[in-house]
Curated annotation (Swiss-Prot):
Functional description taken from the UniProt entry: Peptidoglycan polymerase that catalyzes glycan chain elongation using lipid-linked disaccharide-pentapeptide as the substrate.
Native organism: Staphylococcus haemolyticus (strain JCSC1435)
Membrane topology listed for this record: Single-pass membrane protein
GO CC terms, sorted: outer membrane-bounded periplasmic space; plasma membrane
GO biological process: cell wall organization; peptidoglycan biosynthetic process; regulation of cell shape
Family as reported in the entry's similarity comment: Belongs to the glycosyltransferase 51 family.
Record region (Disordered): 1-36
Protein name: Monofunctional glycosyltransferase
Biased amino acid composition, Polar residues: 1-10
Length: 270
């Protein structure tokens, strides 16, 4: 076949006669940016917008929390059974710290890791899953109801930061221990110790026997579900929770190994 005949029979020649576009398979079209770069620019813009809105929202919440009046927390000290954390044995404070907020003495009102987990859980499940420090729980118990929402969690977080700026750690711990529900209409740790064990958390008191390590661990383990965990008829789940608490107290050096072993032995009698 002659060269002219081959040219006439080629697809390119036929496409020209039919007014069809001829596509160059050797070169990329000029003037159109690659899709990947375009997608990156869109993502970057969306990210900048998100960061701006987030920063604006956080700034507004921080401003509002800075105006919050947390002086009212001092009224907790007016309770007749109030006992300051300064007057409690270290293992009493340790029982609650090791169970509820291991980093209590290190953070400034909220724990970044725990709070981030809780906030993302809130967004995904429409619910709040843990993450609250002792300071946040103190704020929630005093200022807010049991509403579970993203907005309430943020308010709690920033007011907790204000509380940390205004009060010492022992003051905050005192507020917490004297304003949580222990079950059976008991709202201070002293009244709970009196009611359940006939003991006192005040290490300077001679009127009653001092609360034991095990009793402290029981109360600290109970506040998570005070209406469910029954001290007079302990479930296996409750006992396991108490054992976990005692282990944490030993690991964090709030109690010695001998105190730990003694408490475990006493727990078997329940």
């Amino acid at each position: 076949m002659k060269r002219s005949q081959r040219m006439n029979n080629s697809p390119e020649r036929h496409s020209q006669y039919r007014n069809e576009p001829h596509y160059n398979t050797y070169y990329q079209p000029v003037g159109k940016p690659p899709k990947k770069k375009k997608n990156k620019r869109i993502f970057l813009r969306l990210f900048i917008i998100f960061v701006f809105i987030y920063a604006l929202f956080i700034g507004l919440m921080y401003y509002l929390s800075s105006r919050a009046n947390v002086d009212d927390l001092k009224t907790i000290e007016n309770k007749s059974s109030y006992v300051s954390a300064d007057n409690m044995p270290d293992y009493v404070k340790g029982a609650f710290i090791s169970m509820e907020d291991e980093r209590f003495y290190k953070h400034h009102g909220f724990d970044v890791k725990g709070t981030t987990r809780a906030l993302f859980s809130t967004i995904g499940d429409r619910d709040v899953q843990g993450g609250s420090t002792i300071t946040q729980q103190t704020v929630k118990n005093y200022y807010y109801d049991n509403e579970r929402s993203f907005t309430r969690k943020l308010k709690e977080l920033f007011v907790a930061h204000k509380v940390e700026q205004q009060y010492s750690k022992n003051e905050i711990l005192s507020f917490y221990l004297n304003n949580i529900y222990y079950g059976s209409d008991q709202y201070t740790i002293e009244s709970a110790a009196n009611y359940y064990f006939g003991t006192t958390v005040n290490k300077n008191s001679d009127s009653m026997s001092q609360i034991t390590v095990l009793q402290s661990a029981i109360l600290a383990s109970k506040v998570n579900a005070p209406s469910v965990y029954d001290i007079s008829n302990m479930s296996d789940n409750f006992k396991n929770r108490i054992k976990t608490n005692l282990e944490k107290m030993k690991q964090q050096e709030y109690i010695s190994d001998s105190q730990y072993q003694e408490a475990l032995s006493q727990l078997n009698n329940y």
